[in-house]
Amino acid sequence: MNIRNARPEDLMNMQHCNLLCLPENYQMKYYFYHGLSWPQLSYIAEDEDGKIVGYVLAKMEEDPDDVPHGHITSLAVKRSHRRLGLAQKLMDQASRAMIENFSAKYVSLHVRKSNRAALHLYSNTLNFQVSEVEPKYYADGEDAYAMKRDLAQMADELRRQLVLKKSRYVVLGSEENQEAQDSTLPDAEEACQPENPAGKGSEACQPENPAGKGSEACQPENPAGKDTGSHSTDVQDSSEYLDSTS
């Protein structure tokens, strides 16, 4: 299962999912209104074949007299894919996007008083609180619970994760700089080799015998000029069960 941001080409399948799951339905222009105005806020759940099995349609409320806050317009998951935690993941993704993109302080929604499964998810899992009852909110005359979820705790957690992420980058960058610096420095043996300005001996083969005795590992260069023949040395890697709209 995959949760991702909804794209324009997903809107028709989102509407189809809505028609299968909910009594509250919307014309396609309403989906486009959300998708064009707040493209960051709506998400879909798709199965292994790329088919949409759930969605959340969300927006920001345009109330100049209130703090920035989002609203869940519609949430649905097909019956064949319920109790997999998809509704909770969709809601959390939308809420997180509201914080990151619009600094939302809370998110609101409406739910039918008779929708016990949705009420259980919102109240017990997602920490929504009932703010008021709106009489005859739905077209069939049923009342709705208006609910709100404070996003301060989620915002704090997102800030904490961001700080940790930045600190990891700083530490990683420091380690890479140190490795780069170390790679440019000579090792201890190279740093201690004399440059032999007098021209004596060979840097590749310094004699270990200061007393002047011969060594098989390092033959002298025959300064006396005697013919000794040729001499060479070879050196040998991711639970829900609901429908909800407002």
UniProtKB/Swiss-Prot annotation:
Q: Where is this region: Interaction with NAA15?
A: 1-58
Q: What GO molecular function annotation could you give as one example from this UniProt entry?
A: protein-N-terminal-glutamate acetyltransferase activity
Q: Which Pfam families has this protein been placed in?
A: Acetyltransf_1
Protein EC: 2.3.1.255
Renumbered to this chain, the Polar residues biased-composition regions fall at: 230-246
Record SUPFAM superfamilies = Acyl-CoA N-acyltransferases (Nat) (SSF55729)
Q: List the InterPro entries hit by this protein, alphabetically.
A: Acyl_CoA_acyltransferase, Ard1-like, GNAT_dom
Region annotation Disordered: where it falls in the sequence: 175-246
Q: What is the stated purpose of this protein? A: Displays alpha (N-terminal) acetyltransferase activity. Proposed alternative catalytic subunit of the N-terminal acetyltransferase A (NatA) complex.
Where does the N-acetyltransferase domain start and stop, copy by copy? 1-152
Organism source for this protein? Rattus norvegicus
Do you know which PROSITE patterns this protein is assigned to?
GNAT
What's this protein's name? N-alpha-acetyltransferase 11
So what does this thing catalyse?
N-terminal glycyl-[protein] + acetyl-CoA = N-terminal N(alpha)-acetylglycyl-[protein] + CoA + H(+); N-terminal L-alanyl-[protein] + acetyl-CoA = N-terminal N(alpha)-acetyl-L-alanyl-[protein] + CoA + H(+); N-terminal L-seryl-[protein] + acetyl-CoA = N-terminal N(alpha)-acetyl-L-seryl-[protein] + CoA + H(+); N-terminal L-valyl-[protein] + acetyl-CoA = N-terminal N(alpha)-acetyl-L-valyl-[protein] + CoA + H(+)
Q: Which PANTHER family match?
A: N-ALPHA-ACETYLTRANSFERASE 10, N-TERMINAL ACETYLTRANSFERASE
**Cell compartment(s), UniProt:** Cytoplasm; Nucleus
> What Gene3D superfamilies does this protein map onto?
3.40.630.30
